[in-house]
Design a protein with these regions (language model features):
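Cytosolic regulatory modules rich in charged/polar residues
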Residues: 1-97
Length: 97
C-alpha cells in the first residue's frame, strides 16, 4: 500500500509517489511559487529539505505539512509520514457580527 492512514491525521506514504499525488490525497495546495515540485518524487523532494543525509525520524515542516522520514535503506528514503497541520484560514471563522 502506497498511502496508508495511520490515524490522528497522519499518513504513511511511499517515497516514489509524486509530491502532487500526495498533496492531492491530503487536500493540500502546492504554493504557486513552488509548482515545480509537483512532479518530484516524495523521497527526492524530502532529501532536498535536509542539509545532511536524513535518518529515520528526521522531520521538516512545509507550508502546513509536517513530514517525517519513517523508513530508510542505505541512505535512501523509502517511506515518509505526512501530517497536515492546521491551516491558518481554518481558524479565522466565526468573527462575523
Amino acid at each position: 500500500e502506497s498511502f496508508v492512514p495511520l490515524g490522528g491525521g497522519r499518513y504513511e506514504v511511499d517515497a516514489d509517489l509524486t509530491v502532487g499525488e500526495v498533496f492531492d490525497k491530503l487536500d493540500l495546495e502546492i504554493p504557486d511559487d513552488d509548482e515545480n515540485i509537483e512532479h518530484k518524487l516524495m523521497g527526492e523532494w524530502a532529501y532536498e529539505q535536509f542539509d545532511h543525509i536524513p535518518s529515520e525520524r528526521d522531520q521538516f515542516a512545509y507550508d502546513g505539512l509536517e513530514v517525517t522520514v519513517s523508513k530508510m535503506r542505505q541512505h535512501r528514503i523509502l517511506k515518509l509520514v505526512c501530517h497536515p497541520t492546521a491551516k491558518p484560514e481554518e481558524t479565522k471563522g466565526g468573527d462575523e457580527a
